[in-house]
């Protein structure tokens, strides 16, 4: 199957987001070391706090070694499914959303879990009553899902406005 131009865009977005995620994690480990709990204020409520996340995004579903590998295998399947979907991307928001979600699943759940056995989290805004420490990939998946939802809403509005498919 041919990959659309927006499909290639989704893949490019994924690569850039993976690189940014991994660079940020390498930098944080070089800055704070590898001991969980190491913390440094940045400004206002923003702190850099190293957390070894054995669960999913925002520390959800922490568990055993079996959970680690189950999440890794599940993430690989998600990456493959999203990569196939991205090949057919026809709308910019869809391409952007898929690229960001692919990056998050690949960067967090494949690279980190295989490399470290956990995900490196470090963005800490708990002083704003947001209890989870997260990373660039967590932000990417959140933004990616928002883009897909927005894409879905906008494409549904077009279908309602032009039910016969004309005028698109």
Name the predicted role of every residue range:
Residues 1-168:
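Alpha-helical transmembrane bundles and membrane-interface segments of multipass inner-membrane proteins
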